[in-house]
């Protein structure tokens, strides 16, 4: 008569062991594993341009609206760099401005490199 109890005990231990193991994998691989306690993940920014177009169209500017920063300036070459902390801006003679990573160069080094490139020496 002890056999049915033994089989029941073995099956119960096996069931709870499997359940604990799969709960571990669910939690490890982002399945939640919390028994219904799922955390709300923030949504990524959409990959299409609709959001940007809405922001651009809603911006109030009576002069020139910079496409990269949505800043309102008097002339296109006055547009600021999007990441002023890590980018350096130079204005070219044709009313065009460009921004590039400072890259650890000394102050003004980017402008020198652009000038050399414009002369064909770089």
From Swiss-Prot:
The keyword Ion transport does not apply. Residues 1-20 form the signal peptide. One of its GO terms (biological process) is ERAD pathway. The keyword Translocase does not apply. CDD domains: LCL2-like (cd23996). Keywords: Signal. Probable component of the endoplasmic reticulum-associated degradation (ERAD) pathway. Belongs to the LCL2 family. This is Long chronological lifespan protein 2. The gene is LCL2.
């Amino acid at each position: 008569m002890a056999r049915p109890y033994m089989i029941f005990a073995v099956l119960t231990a096996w069931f709870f062991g499997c359940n604990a193991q799969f709960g571990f994998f669910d939690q490890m691989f982002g399945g939640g594993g919390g028994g219904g306690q799922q955390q709300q993940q923030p949504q990524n920014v959409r990959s299409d341009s609709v959001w940007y177009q809405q922001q651009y169209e809603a911006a109030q500017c009576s002069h020139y609206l910079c496409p990269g920063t949505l800043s309102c300036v008097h002339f296109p070459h006055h547009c600021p760099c999007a990441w002023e902390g890590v980018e350096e801006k130079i204005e070219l003679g044709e009313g065009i401005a460009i921004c590039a990573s400072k890259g650890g160069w000394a102050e003004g080094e980017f402008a020198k490199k652009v000038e050399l490139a414009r002369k064909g020496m770089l």
